[in-house]
Amino acid sequence: MSQQVIIFDTTLRDGEQALQASLSVKEKIQIAMALERMGVDVMEVGFPVSSPGDFESVQTIARQIKNSRVCGLARCVDKDIDVAAEALRVAEAFRIHVFLATSTLHIESKLKRSFDEVLEMAIRSVKRARNYTDDVEFSCEDAGRTPIDNLCRVVEAAINAGATTINIPDTVGYTTPNQFGGIITTLYDRVPNIDKAIISVHCHDDLGMAVGNSIAAVQAGARQVEGTLNGIGERAGNTSLEEVIMAIKVRQDIMNVHTNINHQEIFRTSQIVSQLCNMPIPANKAIVGSNAFAHSSGIHQDGVLKNRENYEIMSPQTIGLKDVQLNLTSRSGRAAVKHRMEGMGYKEQDYNLDNLYAAFLKLADKKGQVFDYDLEALAFINKQQEEPEHFSLDYFSVQSGSSIMATASVKLICGEEEKAEAATGNGPVDAVYQAINRITGYPIELVKYQLTAKGQGRDALGQVDIVVSYNGRRFHGVGLATDIVESSAKAMVHVLNNIWRSQQVEKEKQRLQQSKHQNNQETV
């Protein structure tokens, strides 16, 4: 029977240290609740003695969480431990996590003490924490650079003092997987009371090896892994918990361990952390990046259509994603285009695949990714990007400030007509969008808005990517300008033209259907 690996999340403590602005208590609660739904065993939610705000947030979260153990950090200082206990005592179950540097470098240059003094501090602090709870974790800060003899001594002493979890951090991301796994093996071989505590690891990603080191430690016997969602944290970040969790699940053939994580909550929790922490997830991020299950190569797309396991070692549904569509680009083959048309309900006799694919390649070379409504336009009205747009932005102006409601005036050229409207909104961008909606009358709902800086300095461009919902379908738009409001307006105009083309497609489909019906009647 496989053993459990405890998942210890420190997004709200170590992860928050990477943020430019602290999270509010409300935001921390949102993340804590998401982590609880995901099934983390332990969540470290703050450093209570560090500030009144941190104390309040730890205490508030401790009251709310029922199914995960809540943990607070403390130095080997009496006040730290007492304050942590006070903040945590309202929890259903809690842990006090005390830490102390053990490497020669830290002891001599930071603590300016002897190793024997450090050993005594560790023993005294673990015993003090045990006065408040039976669940005490002791961390050997900078364990990766601690002489192994000293590390074995402090681990044995901390366990004798009452520590139930011993954490071995690679604080500066210095070790390699072979080396780090060897440290864990040595502890099991040389510490006589090691069986009385759970060995935990906490790895940083300075050399890009945090996940590799954590997996090596698990294979060597560690039964708790600490990390953060999306790998956020100081410097290069922490171990990405979602990567460790899925590695354990996918590679059951070489790791006879499991976690108690609800895997289908991984993607949603990752998105919540990303949005609330204002830290975008790189597209190529393992497990949760937007490209993690994307296939653009024609060879790969063909293989996936035949059997997803050809190029996917896990299904997107496992982490809570719905079925991921293939990205249609200039590298996509005929099979992918045909598959997408079938997904929209079209049969091959409804269109000419040869003509569609030729037109698709021309369009894909110009715009990159091709969407469903683009394919329909190519199949039924053969509209290309170089044709004049139905909607274009003539001008806009906005008035906004801290004491006035944002107001926008917008003039669009709609085919042969010029139309202008004014509207108020929650900020200048919203005001512009409200004015555009008045002009078109389209019942548009904004689903996604993303701003990305292109370049640096005063002349940097702002690229706005939006997704809107219109009559049950989603349409994409992009705008680029040095002015954010202008790029936002251009993105919406791009959306309007995509919607307009889809309307022309529907009209053409109706015309073809009526013509076919009429021909059938004449034949009869």
From Swiss-Prot:
Main subcellular location: cytoplasm
GO term, biological process aspect, one: L-leucine biosynthetic process
Claim: Signal is one of the keywords in the record: no
Reactions that this protein is recorded to catalyse: 3-methyl-2-oxobutanoate + acetyl-CoA + H2O = (2S)-2-isopropylmalate + CoA + H(+)
Keyword vocabulary terms for this entry: Amino-acid biosynthesis, Branched-chain amino acid biosynthesis, Cytoplasm, Leucine biosynthesis, Manganese, Metal-binding, Transferase
PANTHER family: 2-ISOPROPYLMALATE SYNTHASE 1, CHLOROPLASTIC-RELATED, HOMOCITRATE SYNTHASE-RELATED
Record's protein name: 2-isopropylmalate synthase
